[in-house]
């Protein structure tokens, strides 16, 4: 792992210090501020996103409205280390992968990229009147759902068939004047899919190309899911997943910073010592 500057870190959205990342760069060059920060955590509206102030990623290209690659190069030239996000648990409904799935259904190469709710829980419950499999209580009693009801978004494919997908966070469904449904939301990724693993690898490579020295693992604890286990900080799945990500990041010398949703007193950080 490359040496990281453990001095003061600036945390900011790319458009929150003057409107663009270029404005933030100019601020950091200004004499009263110059040298004050060793690193800069640029929050993920740096990328192409649509919701949740950047945490609903369409793709990891740079959002040209508020930032450009030259801004990142300028920060590195100033000796400011970059901290960037990879959002592990979910992607935007507007992502190319989910849009391909909506159009092609089972013919899509991304049919296993997201979590087919009914397939995940097959044999563990009964289908309700909406076509959603309701798991028996024994399977979900230890699970943490962030909103009332089951965490699903039922989507309609281009051929008219419907299917529920795991949706931990935001969702919205609008119907236009022609009766067509339009979706917004953050769809959970199937971390066991080879294509998702490939996507993680490519994203880490992209972030390294941007100059990231530190990568924050957003929604890390929600991503590993297993029938009969917790869906949040499950053990050992959470730590196996972290090791896998660590191995992916190793060629780039980046430090990984997992988002851990727990108080310091719980000592979960101790589980990271073996990594």
Where are these regions (language model features)?
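Acidic/aromatic-lined carbohydrate-recognition and catalytic surfaces
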Residues: 2-195, 205, 220-272
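An active-site-proximal structural segment forming one wall of the substrate-binding cleft
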Residues: 195-214
């Amino acid at each position: 792992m490359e040496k990281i500057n453990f001095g003061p870190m600036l945390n900011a959205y790319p458009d929150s210090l003057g409107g663009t990342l270029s404005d933030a760069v100019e601020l950091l060059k200004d004499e009263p501020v110059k040298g004050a920060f060793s690193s800069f955590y640029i929050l993920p509206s740096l990328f192409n996103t649509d919701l949740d102030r950047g945490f609903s990623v369409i793709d990891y290209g740079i959002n040209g409205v508020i930032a450009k690659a030259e801004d990142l190069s300028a920060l590195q030239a100033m000796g400011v280390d970059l901290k960037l996000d990879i959002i592990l648990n979910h992607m935007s409904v507007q992502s190319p992968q989910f849009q391909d799935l909506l159009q092609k259904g089972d013919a899509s190469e991304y049919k296993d990229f997201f979590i087919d709710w009914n397939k995940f829980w097959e044999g563990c419950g009964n289908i309700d009147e909406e076509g959603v499999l309701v798991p028996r209580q024994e399977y979900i009693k230890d699970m943490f759902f962030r909103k009332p009801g089951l965490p699903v978004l039922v989507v309609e494919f281009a051929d008219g068939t419907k299917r529920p997908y795991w949706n931990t966070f935001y969702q919205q469904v609008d119907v236009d004047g022609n009766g067509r449904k339009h979706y917004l939301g953050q769809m959970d990724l199937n971390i066991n899919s080879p294509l998702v693993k490939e996507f993680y690898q490519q994203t880490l490579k992209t972030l390294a190309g941007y100059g990231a020295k530190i990568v924050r693992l957003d929604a890390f604890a929600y991503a590993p899911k297993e029938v009969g286990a917790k869906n949040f900080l499950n053990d050992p799945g959470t730590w196996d997943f972290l090791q896998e990500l660590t191995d992916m990041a190793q060629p780039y010398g980046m430090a990984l910073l997992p988002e851990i949703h727990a108080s310091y007193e719980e000592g979960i950080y101790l589980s990271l010592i073996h990594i």
